[in-house]
Amino acid sequence: MDSSPNEFLNKVIGKKVLIRLSSGVDYKGILSCLDGYMNLALERTEEYVNGKKTNVYGDAFIRGNNVLYVSALDD
């Protein structure tokens, strides 16, 4: 088990993640980088609203204050 959120986030860079926003919208993609404010950059991003895929993006940038949680996904 990871000892801190930062340790977990650094461990999942380059891996597929699920990001849930406070609005309830989900993004799935490859976490490419993040900063100290938890702003996130994703590659090969899919957007899900109410469980349905609504958009596909090459790259997406998500502002950290909108993030409810980040979860690692199986490859």
Swiss-Prot record:
Disulfide bonding pattern of the chain: none
Protein location: Cytoplasm; Nucleus, Nucleolus
Function in brief: Component of LSm protein complexes, which are involved in RNA processing and may function in a chaperone-like manner. Component of the cytoplasmic LSM1-LSM7 complex which is involved in mRNA degradation by activating the decapping step. The LSM1-LSM7 complex loads onto the 3'-end of single stranded RNA. Component of the nuclear LSM2-LSM8 complex, which is involved in spliceosome assembly. The LSM2-LSM8 complex plays a role in the biogenesis of the spliceosomal U4/U6-U5 tri-snRNP complex by accelerating prp24-mediated annealing of U4/U6 di-snRNA.
Known partners and oligomeric status: Component of the heptameric LSM1-LSM7 complex that forms a seven-membered ring structure with a donut shape. The LSm subunits are arranged in the order lsm1, lsm2, lsm3, lsm6, lsm5, lsm7 and lsm4. Component of the heptameric LSM2-LSM8 complex that forms a seven-membered ring structure with a donut shape. The LSm subunits are arranged in the order lsm8, lsm2, lsm3, lsm6, lsm5, lsm7 and lsm4.
Keywords: Cytoplasm, mRNA processing, mRNA splicing, Nucleus, Ribonucleoprotein, RNA-binding, rRNA processing, Spliceosome, tRNA processing
Family: Belongs to the snRNP Sm proteins family. SmF/LSm6 subfamily.
One Pfam family, short name: LSM
Record's GO cellular component terms: Lsm1-7-Pat1 complex; Lsm2-8 complex; nucleolus; nucleus; P-body; sno(s)RNA-containing ribonucleoprotein complex; spliceosomal complex; telomerase holoenzyme complex
Name the UniProt record assigns to this protein: LSM complex subunit lsm6
Domain of life: Eukaryota
InterPro entries registered for this protein in UniProt: Lsm6/sSmF, LSM_dom_sf, Sm, Sm_dom_euk/arc
BP GO annotations: maturation of SSU-rRNA; mRNA splicing, via spliceosome; telomerase holoenzyme complex assembly; tRNA processing
GO terms assigned for molecular function: poly(U) RNA binding; RNA binding; U2 snRNA binding
Organism for this UniProt entry: Schizosaccharomyces pombe (strain 972 / ATCC 24843) (Fission yeast)
Domain Sm span(s) in chain numbering: 4-75
